[in-house]
């Protein structure tokens, strides 16, 4: 499952203060579903655990603090930051097809 923070339906550049998250299900390189979830009220360190509970394995973000990146990595969730401002299905498709132009890839493997 891929999580993407959204504002006005596209990638939100400020991870911790987004309006919604797109949770995208995929099978291989194919998107099989998209669910929109409203995050709990912002608290530092809360979102990595909340998304882990949803079964998320990858996060695509515009910008994210190092503490959040570390918390995701502790939960074995891959983080891709510096992604372009695009609709969530486009970003997920780019990730699944290894064409995502992110500035950095923070993963534990």
What kind of feature is each model-predicted range?
Residues 57:
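Short acidic/polar active-site loop segments enriched in Thr and Asp
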Residues 10, 46-47, 87-90:
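Short acidic active-site motifs
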Residues 42, 64-67:
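Short Gly/Pro-enriched loop/turn and capping motifs at secondary-structure junctions
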Residues 33-54:
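Compact, glycine-rich, soluble single-domain proteins
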Residues 1-39:
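N-terminal first-folded block
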Residues 60-61:
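Conserved SAM-binding loop
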Residues 66-109:
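C-terminal structural segments of small proteins and small subunits
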């Amino acid at each position: 499952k891929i999580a993407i923070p959204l504002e006005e339906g596209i990638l939100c550049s400020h991870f911790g203060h987004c309006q919604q998250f797109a949770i995208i299900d995929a099978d291989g390189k194919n998107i099989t579903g998209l669910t929109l979830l409203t995050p709990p009220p912002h608290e530092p360190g809360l979102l990595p655990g909340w998304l882990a509970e949803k079964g998320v394995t990858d996060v695509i973000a515009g910008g994210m603090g190092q503490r959040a990146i570390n918390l995701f990595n502790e939960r074995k969730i891959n983080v891709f930051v510096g992604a372009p401002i695009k609709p969530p299905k486009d970003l997920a498709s780019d990730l699944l097809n290894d064409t995502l132009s992110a500035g950095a890839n923070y993963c534990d493997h």
